Design a protein with these regions (language model features):
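Short, Lys/Arg-enriched segments at the junction into DNA-binding effector domains
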Residues: 2, 110-172
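N-terminal/domain-start alpha-helical segments
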Residues: 1-123
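DNA major-groove recognition helices of helix-turn-helix
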Residues: 157-158, 174, 197, 201
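Short glycine-rich hinge loops at helix-strand junctions in the catalytic core
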Residues: 24, 165, 205
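Residues within helix-turn-helix
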Residues: 106, 172, 188
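N-terminal positioning helix adjacent to the helix-turn-helix/winged-helix DNA-binding module
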Residues: 153, 186-188
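Short helix-coil junctions and helix-kink-helix linkers
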Residues: 177-182
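DNA-binding patch around the recognition helix
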Residues: 122-126, 149, 192-194, 198-223
Length: 223
């Protein structure tokens, strides 16, 4: 899953990004509101972490513009402002959660998981497709009750597919979940990851189906 982090303090951005990457997420870092507004308008994120006090365009305006476009991506606001009126303002604009600075990285990670659990899993702890199970808190896939050994890229592809049941995902859509803004997104490499995943899933009652010219679908099999 791909997360956008918008924070103008370089050291804080680096530490938060590293913590999220260590937890297994793909993270894009931006440092101003205009860049964030552009990215949120063109990229597909599972979650946005948005500082209020951004240069060029503050976090409140970025959030307001995001919701005005009809985007429902969950947003966690970071703020050094402790006033209730600021938190209320952000929540009224469409923020999903607030975290006041300074904060512990463990609390931020817990809030990220809670937001993703609500938005991706509908409040559930796990997603299932056949005998493939994904646990959001541990970010582990199991097949027939055995842990799957996946690379970070394979994990990102499989997360994207299991989070969108019944939906055919194009190579470009999958690539957007695998590669960050500072990486060259390769749709062709998705074929390689899908091939590897098929090998790892073949003993279970789940498969990745190819729809030529459209993309891939993760589905349970009857046998």
């Amino acid at each position: 899953m791909r997360i956008l982090l918008v924070e103008d303090h370089p050291q804080l951005a680096a530490s938060v990004s590293q913590a999220l990457k260590n937890a297994g997420w793909t993270v894009d870092i931006l440092h101003d509101g205009v860049a964030a507004d552009l990215a949120l308008g063109s990229e597909d994120y599972a979650l946005a972490i948005l500082d209020v006090g951004l240069p060029r365009m503050d976090g409140f305006e970025v959030l307001a513009r995001l919701r005005a476009r009809g985007k429902t991506v969950p947003v966690l606001m970071l703020t050094a402002r402790g006033e209730v009126k600021d938190r209320v303002h952000g929540l009224n604009l469409g923020a999903d959660d607030y975290l006041a600075k300074p904060f512990e990285l463990s609390e931020l990670e817990a809030r990220v998981k809670a937001l993703l659990r609500r938005s991706v899993l509908g409040g559930e702890q796990q997603l299932r497709c056949g005998d493939l199970v994904y646990d959001l808190d541990t970010r582990r896939f199991t097949l027939l009750d055995e842990s799957l050994n996946l690379t970070s890229r394979e994990q990102a592809v499989l997360e994207a597919m299991i989070a969108r049941p019944g939906r055919v995902m194009s190579k470009e859509q999958l690539a957007s979940q695998v590669f960050g803004l500072d990486e060259e997104a390769s749709a062709d490499s998705i074929e390689i990851y899908v091939h590897r995943l098929r090998k790892k899933l073949e003993r279970g009652s789940v498969r990745i189906v190819t729809f030529r010219g459209l993309g891939y679908l993760l589905e349970a099999t009857s046998g």
